[in-house]
Amino acid sequence: MIKNAVSLVTGGASGLGRATAERLAKQGASVILADLPSSKGNEVAKELGDKVVFVPVDVTSEKDVSAALQTAKDKFGRLDLTVNCAGTATAVKTFNFNKNVAHRLEDFQRVININTVGTFNVIRLSAGLMGANEPNQDGQRGVIVNTASVAAFDGQIGQAAYSASKAAVVGMTLPIARDLSTQGIRICTIAPGLFNTPMLAALPEKVRTFLAKSIPFPQRLGEPSEYAHLVQAIYENPLLNGEVIRIDGALRMMP
């Protein structure tokens, strides 16, 4: 059960990450809330209670992630669950023929670096700390949950970088599950559809309504709390491993 678990949530200051940190804390887990120094992570951690600790982290930095894990070890003694919610997006066509301009390579690399390399960085370092845990009755020592996107499967115009970065997260899930199985560490990936996150909240109401109607059922945007609920379900179900779970209301994005 999630109660008394020690967790690390990246991207925990907003959106899916914040909802996850909030649910875990309410269920009695301890949370290392990791986000950029410029985020509202410190305020969020104070709001969520004494068992939530903010650590400033750039997920692409080995030093930052190692510091967050050391905080988990020093303050709570171990790490049971890592949830990778940190990420970024861009909307740029491969080539803009109207302006005769190609997609900037550095922008493509930045998205890959944060979403793919950053996720793997957190996974590999978390696994090292989890491996020191005493196994439970199933031999489990830890659980890792990643965040991909339906864009990994149904990428839209202008989403080459974002889709590639999330498809890589999908692709690494099974081999990492196999890598870590000998130490009793499970890993799953959640692929959200259209969710009521700060990014979508900034869109006009007319656009949000249109997007909601594109979802077969239920015809509404997903709530971050529903993502967080799935994180808890993955943690508490020992047979979920090496799997990618779409949470999208049967949405299949058309170009």
Swiss-Prot record:
Q: Name one GO molecular function term.
A: 3-hydroxyacyl-CoA dehydrogenase activity
Keyword NAD included in the entry's annotation: yes
> What's the top EC group for this one?
oxidoreductase
Q: What induces it?
A: By 20-hydroxyecdysone.
**InterPro entries per record:** NAD(P)-bd_dom_sf, Sc_DH/Rdtase_CS, SDR_fam
Active-site residues, as the UniProt record annotates them: Y162 (proton acceptor)
**Where in the cell does this protein reside?**
Mitochondrion
Gene3D superfamilies named among the record's database cross-references = NAD(P)-binding Rossmann-like Domain (3.40.50.720)
Q: Which Pfam families match?
A: adh_short
Listed binding positions for substrate are: S149
Q: Where does NAD(+) bind?
A: S14, L16, D35, D58, V59, C85, Y162, K166, F195, T197
Mostly located where?
mitochondrion
What pH-dependence text does the entry carry?
Answer: Optimum pH is 9.3 for the dehydrogenase reaction, and 6.4 for the reductase reaction.
Q: What Enzyme Commission number does this protein have?
A: 1.1.1.35, 1.1.1.51, 1.1.1.62, 1.1.1.-
Q: Which UniProt keywords apply?
A: Mitochondrion, NAD, Oxidoreductase, tRNA processing
Q: Which reaction does it catalyse?
A: a (3S)-3-hydroxyacyl-CoA + NAD(+) = a 3-oxoacyl-CoA + NADH + H(+); (3S)-3-hydroxybutanoyl-CoA + NAD(+) = acetoacetyl-CoA + NADH + H(+); testosterone + NAD(+) = androst-4-ene-3,17-dione + NADH + H(+); 5alpha-androstane-3alpha,17beta-diol + NAD(+) = 17beta-hydroxy-5alpha-androstan-3-one + NADH + H(+)
SMART domains listed in its UniProt record: PKS_KR
Knockout or disruption consequences = Embryonic and pupal lethal. Pupation is developmentally delayed and pupae fail to enclose into adults. Males, before the onset of lethality, have small testes and degenerating spermatocytes with a large accumulation of small fat-containing vesicles in the cytoplasm and almost no mitochondria. Photoreceptors fail to differentiate normally, are unable to form proper rhabdomeres and contain smaller mitochondria with swollen crestae. Larvae display reduced ATP and mitochondrial morphological defects, that are indicative of mitochondrial dysfunction.
What's a GO cellular component annotated to this UniProt protein? mitochondrial ribonuclease P complex
Q: Does the keyword tRNA processing apply?
A: yes
Would you identify the family this protein belongs to, as annotated?
Belongs to the short-chain dehydrogenases/reductases (SDR) family.
Q: Which PANTHER family match?
A: 17-BETA-HYDROXYSTEROID DEHYDROGENASE 14-RELATED, SHORT-CHAIN DEHYDROGENASE/REDUCTASE
- Role, per record: Mitochondrial dehydrogenase involved in pathways of fatty acid, and steroid metabolism. Versatile enzyme presenting two types of activity; L-3-hydroxyacyl-CoA dehydrogenase ((3S)-3-hydroxyacyl-CoA dehydrogenase) activity and hydroxysteroid dehydrogenase (HSD) activity with a wide substrate spectrum. As a (3S)-3-hydroxyacyl-CoA dehydrogenase, it functions in the third step of the fatty acid beta-oxidation pathway, a major metabolic process in which fatty acids are oxidized to provide a significant source of energy, while also generating acyl-CoA metabolites used by many metabolic routes. In addition to mitochondrial dehydrogenase activity, moonlights as a component of mitochondrial ribonuclease P, a complex that cleaves tRNA molecules in their 5'-ends. Essential for the structural and functional integrity of mitochondria. Function is essential for pupal development.
Subunit info here reads: Component of mitochondrial ribonuclease P, a complex composed of rswl/MRPP1, scu/MRPP2 and mldr/MRPP3.
Q: What name does this protein carry? A: 3-hydroxyacyl-CoA dehydrogenase type-2
